[in-house]
Amino acid sequence: MNAKRIRGLLILAAVIAIAVLIWRHFTQTTPAAPGTSEQHAARTSHSENSGSGGGRRAAMRTLAPVQAALTQSASVPHYLSGLGTVTAANTVTLRSRVNGQLMALHFQEGQQVKVGDLLAEIDPRPFQVELTQAQGQLAKDQAALLNTRQDLARYQQLVKTNLISRQELDTQTAAVRQAEGALKADEGAVASAQLQLDYSKITAPISGRIGLKQVDVGNYITSGDTNGIVVITQTYPIDVVFTVPEAEISTILNAQKSGQPPVVEAWDRANQKKLSQGILLSMDNQIDTTTGTIKLKARFDNLDDALFPNQFVNIRMKVDTLKNAVVAPSAAVQMGNDGRFVWILNNKNEVSKRQVTTSIQYGQLVVVTAGLDADVQVVTDGIDRLTEGAKVEIVPSALTEKTPAIAGEKS
């Protein structure tokens, strides 16, 4: 009995709970009072009115943001680039031209020397002895020649009186000639001995920088020593050998025909610092078939020792100046299926694609040879979001006003 009563009470409680939930649901969805509805409508209207300007601003914010720059007309220098190695204008391995003991070295390693400076001495005594002997033989043969000439003069008088035969006169004449020949040989021997003595003093054959010595004082050296005494490199001036593609040969030849040798700049390994400026000296007479390049040589004064033999440098050679060329930022030029193109802007900030033809690049600029005129606004950033005819928003940038002017080359 108690169990049935409890069960009935639970069912009654559940029914009451369900009824309460249904009542609360219908009371919340009942339409609001007229005053409340009007207030809600007013708030809604105010919200819409106040948000209309924000909606327009939101619409503007959906425009693709881009940066732009104006193309311009300028005189653009045309440079060819290449990799080069610094080489001494002249390199000499200083060797002795006579054999003997090295008695002295008159230089410091690394110093600059001038042509004719005394650099080393070989023991001169053996050569002085040879010179003395040659001079003695010369004196002896000079006396013999004088005697034979005097005899010839007597024979010439005697033959007139038939006191001697004609054959004896001819014999004496031949003796004089033999003595004259011996005298010439003696003179040559003296000159040779003097030359050997002079060679015992070794002088600088060129002006340049002394390297590290290859032999010490006291050693016996010969003219056939492979390493020699020291190496001298001429660094004032100095040369750079570099290569350019064979396709540029005609451009270089035309530049040489202008009357002035092309200007060549040497830059450091990182291509960040200009080291020196010189001129093109010569071009090789054949192309390297393995690389498709040709060698050129440039010469630099190098008075500041900015270049050193075997140094690696980057080369920039000016071969021409393009007058009144249309230039645009390199960032504006894109590559598509139909070739290179740019996005141009009209006065309504609408973009359109324009096919262009380009040539040389100079810094952050590229020369446009077809498809663009000067003072045309082109997109430089935000290009990946553009479509034909789309309206864009130009955001400030250092390139917005104009492309960077070419220093000293602006037309």
From Swiss-Prot:
Keyword check for ATP-binding: no
Residue ranges with Polar residues bias: 31-49
Leader peptide range in chain numbering: 1-19
InterPro entries named among the record's database cross-references: CusB_D23 (IPR032317), Multidrug-R_MdtA (IPR022824), RND_pump_MFP (IPR006143)
Membrane topology according to the record: Peripheral membrane protein
Chain positions covered by the region annotation Disordered: 31-58
Compartments (UniProt record): Cell inner membrane
Keywords, alphabetical: Cell inner membrane, Cell membrane, Membrane, Signal, Transport
NCBIfam families: PRK11556.1, RND_mfp
UniProt name for this protein: Multidrug resistance protein MdtA
Organism, scientific name: Pectobacterium atrosepticum (strain SCRI 1043 / ATCC BAA-672) (Erwinia carotovora subsp. atroseptica)
High-level lineage: Bacteria, Pseudomonadati, Pseudomonadota, Gammaproteobacteria, Enterobacterales
Gene coding for it: mdtA
